[in-house]
C-alpha cells in the first residue's frame, strides 16, 4: 500500500459543506475555508518549479466544489501543459461533475477518471447522505466515455450501516447498466475505444464525531460474503475489475479510531514489537497484532462490532 504519493500537493480548500454521514474530515474540519485563487496558482507554480514533479494535485475534501476551480486550472495549464505536467484531482463528486472541468484536469493525457458513488443502491446513498442519483452516475460516465475516456474508477464502501445483499444486487445492476449503455453509445456514435471499469471497495469503518460513530462495523465474514456475492453477480461483465481492501486492516482501524485509554497498553506493546511502519503493506505484521491483542485480553472483533447506545459514554 502507498501512504504518500509522488506528486506536488497544494491544499485549496479546508472543510466541506456536504456532511456525508460516514466522513470524519467533513465533520471535524469545519468551518469551510477556501484559499484565494491567486495564492493557489503562485504556490503551485513555485512547488512544481522547486521540486521537479511532473504531476500536481489540488487537494480538498471536494475539489470540484471550489468556486474558482476552473479558472485556477486554466491558468496553471498555460504553464504546465506544454511541459507535460499533469493535474491530479481527488475523486470528483458526481453531483458536481462538469465536462469542462474533466477536460481541464486531463488536458495533458486522458487516463483514468475517478468517481465516488460510495454506495451502489439509491436507498443506501440516501442513508449515508450521498445525494446523487443513478441517472447522475450514468450521465457522468457516458459523457466521459463519449468524450475520450476509456477507463473509469469507482470508489464504493462495503459494510455500510443497514447494507444488505439487495444493495449488492443494485450495485451489480448499476455496473451492468453502465456497460450496456456504453455499448449502445459506441454503436450510435461510432466510438473507437472501449470502456474499462475498476471498482475499488473499501470496508466501512465507523468514525468518531460522525453520525455513524455509534454504529458497529459489520462482521468481517458478512462483509466478505457481500463482496463475494457482488463478484459473482458481475463476473459476466467484460472490462470490469473489482478490487477490495484487506478486511483485517479495516477491523484494526475500527478498533483504534473509536478506542479509549484502555488501548494504550496495546499500542505500546505493538510499538515495542516493531509495529510502527504498518501503514505500508510490506511492513504490516498481522500475526503480531492478533497475538498481542490476545496476550492483553483484547477482542478486536468485538470492539470493532460494538454498537454504542445513545446514552452510553463515548471515549
Residue ranges of model-derived segments:
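N-terminal [4Fe-4S]-dependent radical SAM core
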Residues: 1-9
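Iron-sulfur (Fe-S) cluster-binding segments and ferredoxin-like electron-carrier domains
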Residues: 23-39
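Acidic, Ser/Thr-rich peripheral helices and adjacent loops at domain boundaries
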Residues: 77, 105, 112-113, 217-229, ...
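Radical SAM enzyme core and accessory elements
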Residues: 227, 236-315
Amino acid at each position: 500500500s502507498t501512504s504518500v504519493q509522488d506528486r506536488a500537493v497544494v491544499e485549496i480548500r479546508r472543510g466541506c459543506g456536504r456532511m456525508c454521514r460516514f466522513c470524519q474530515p467533513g465533520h471535524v474540519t469545519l468551518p469551510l475555508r477556501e484559499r484565494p485563487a491567486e495564492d493557489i496558482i503562485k504556490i503551485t507554480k513555485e512547488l512544481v518549479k522547486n521540486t521537479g514533479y511532473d504531476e500536481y494535485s489540488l487537494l480538498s475534501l471536494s475539489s470540484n466544489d471550489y468556486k474558482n476551480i476552473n479558472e485556477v486550472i486554466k491558468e496553471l495549464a498555460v504553464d504546465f501543459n506544454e511541459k507535460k505536467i499533469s493535474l491530479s484531482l481527488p475523486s470528483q463528486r458526481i453531483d458536481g461533475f462538469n465536462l469542462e472541468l474533466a477536460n481541464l484536469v486531463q488536458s495533458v493525457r486522458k487516463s483514468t477518471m475517478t468517481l465516488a458513488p460510495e454506495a451502489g443502491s439509491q436507498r443506501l446513498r440516501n442513508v449515508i447522505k450521498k445525494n446523487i442519483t443513478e441517472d447522475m452516475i450514468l450521465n457522468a460516465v457516458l459523457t466521459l466515455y463519449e468524450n475520450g475516456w476509456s477507463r473509469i474508477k469507482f470508489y464504493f464502501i462495503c459494510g455500510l450501516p443497514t447494507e444488505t445483499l439487495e444493495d449488492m444486487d443494485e450495485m451489480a445492476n448499476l455496473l451492468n447498466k453502465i456497460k450496456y449503455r456504453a455499448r449502445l453509445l459506441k454503436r450510435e456514435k461510432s466510438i473507437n475505444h472501449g470502456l474499462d471499469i475498476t471498482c475499488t471497495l473499501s470496508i466501512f469503518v465507523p468514525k468518531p464525531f460522525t453520525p455513524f460513530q455509534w454504529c458497529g462495523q459489520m462482521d468481517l465474514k458478512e462483509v466478505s460474503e457481500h463482496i463475494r456475492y457482488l463478484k459473482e453477480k458481475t463476473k459476466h461483465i467484460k472490462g470490469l475489475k473489482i478490487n477490495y481492501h484487506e478486511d483485517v486492516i479495516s477491523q484494526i482501524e475500527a478498533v483504534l479510531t473509536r478506542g479509549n485509554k484502555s488501548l494504550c497498553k496495546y499500542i505500546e506493546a505493538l510499538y515495542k514489537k516493531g509495529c510502527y511502519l504498518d501503514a505500508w503493506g510490506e511492513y504490516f505484521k498481522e500475526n503480531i497484532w492478533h497475538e498481542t491483542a490476545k496476550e492483553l485480553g483484547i477482542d478486536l472483533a468485538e470492539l470493532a462490532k460494538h454498537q454504542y447506545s445513545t446514552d452510553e459514554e463515548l471515549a
